[in-house]
Design a protein with these regions (language model features):
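Long, charged amphipathic helices and adjacent flexible linkers at domain junctions
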Residues: 1-12
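Cytosolic Rossmann-like ligand/nucleotide-binding regulatory domains
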Residues: 11, 16-79
Length: 79
C-alpha cells in the first residue's frame, strides 16, 4: 500500500529581488519546476485572489503554495 506524504500550505513574500517578480506561473513552469501548486495570491491589503496562470507576480504580494513538505522546503531555498 502506498503511503501518502504529508502536505502543507505556506506563504511566500514576493520582493523586488525575487526570481518570481514580474513573471507568470507559465514563465516559471512553477508546478513542474517545484512540484507545488500556487493556490492564491494575497495583495498588500490582505485580499486573497485565485491564481491565473497568465498573471504576473508583483513585489509586495504573497503567494500561498501547497505541496509536500520536502518540496516546499526546496522551493523556499530556491526563491
Amino acid at each position: 500500500m502506498n503511503r501518502l506524504k504529508p502536505v502543507a500550505i505556506i506563504k511566500i513574500d514576493i520582493t523586488n529581488m525575487s526570481p518570481l517578480c514580474g513573471k507568470t506561473l507559465i514563465d516559471i513552469d512553477f508546478r513542474s519546476r517545484y512540484n507545488c501548486m500556487v493556490v492564491g495570491i494575497e495583495d498588500d491589503m490582505g485580499n486573497l485572489q485565485v491564481t491565473e496562470a497568465q498573471r504576473k507576480f508583483q513585489a509586495g504580494e504573497r503567494i500561498w503554495v501547497v505541496g509536500e513538505e520536502a518540496d516546499l522546503a526546496m522551493l523556499k531555498m530556491g526563491i
